Amino acid sequence: MIDNFENIRHKSIRKKTASRIAAIQILYLHQFNDQPLFESISTYELHYKKFLLQKLDIKELDTNLLSDLLENFDKNIDAFDTIIKNNLSKDWKIGRLGKNELNILRLSIFELKFFKKFDKKTIINEYVSLFNNFCGEPDFANGFLNNVLKSE
């Protein structure tokens, strides 16, 4: 799990950032352990949530955002994957992406294309930062997400 939070921004948006981090971690548990999502949420609550809250110096996540992210993930996964396939360069195939890379791109697509609650540039910056923390290669994430925006 992530423990490098140096480039996570100030407290006023930490609840949203924490919710996105929690979603990434819960989805990883869900896929890695091949367990139902509700079990992964319970595992996360028991073992990881407290650490995240302490690291970001907050008392609670933005539970509405976390619920929106998780509830819409499985519902729209095929649409997310189609958008990913259509926006990868010719040299890349979706199967080449790791679990966290793929989930971060899926979540960012949800917020950019379906949720549309926050400013698009803010969403891109947030997910590029998260991609960098979890996977490295922020330039890949930035280029990919800008391609997604241009394809609208």
Model-inferred region functions:
Residues M1-E152:
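N-terminal interaction/assembly modules
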